[in-house]
Amino acid sequence: MKNILLLLLATFIISCNNTDSNFKIEKGVVGRINIETKIEQLDSIFSNDSIVKRIGEGDYVFSSSDKYLIFDKKKNHLLTIMPKQQHDPDETIETVQIFSKNFKTAKGVNIESSFIDISKNHKISNIQNTINNVIVFVDEIDAYFIIDKKNMDFKFQNETDRKIEIKDIPPKSKVKRFMIGWN
């Protein structure tokens, strides 16, 4: 009886650890996919989830890239995956957009994090100034975070030529998009 209880406890602990690894973000890895995952593998990797394929044909004929939207059984949007090359199931992944707060870095940063969470927990590699957003790059995890400039000082809001530094981004600025790029 004790052996059965120990076996059940061990199984429970292992399954809990596996669940966490299904949502971890680290360099070259997002949950169950990695930098070497091919598009043709997505159906088997996400066999318990739902995949919406927006391939560059039909309604999406003018789309510049194929998109694979991953939803869980409760219809929650988890990820959107874009391959390096359109129409090639043997191609690897170029970009992953994170939609679920369950996907986190080892330091707890997720789609619901604010800029202060990113800057305190990860080394910021670069900051790009675009028309409406700031793009914050974190090379140690292949990530970039898009943050809306609407909460920034007015002098940054409508200019793209101004250099933006860490101190210029309000700490409570929320992440608009959490992207992983594997170029």
Label every PLM stretch briefly.
Residues 16-131, 140-141, 159-183:
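Short helix/turn-capping signatures at newly exposed starts of structured segments
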Residues 135-139, 143-148:
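Short, structured protein-protein interaction patches enriched in aromatics and acidic/basic residues
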Residues 1-23:
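Bacterial Sec-dependent N-terminal signal peptides
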Residues 95, 150-151:
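Charged, low-complexity, helix-prone segments enriched in Lys/Glu/Asp/Gln
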Residues 154-155:
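Short, solvent-exposed loop/beta-turn-alpha elements that line the ligand-binding surface or hinge
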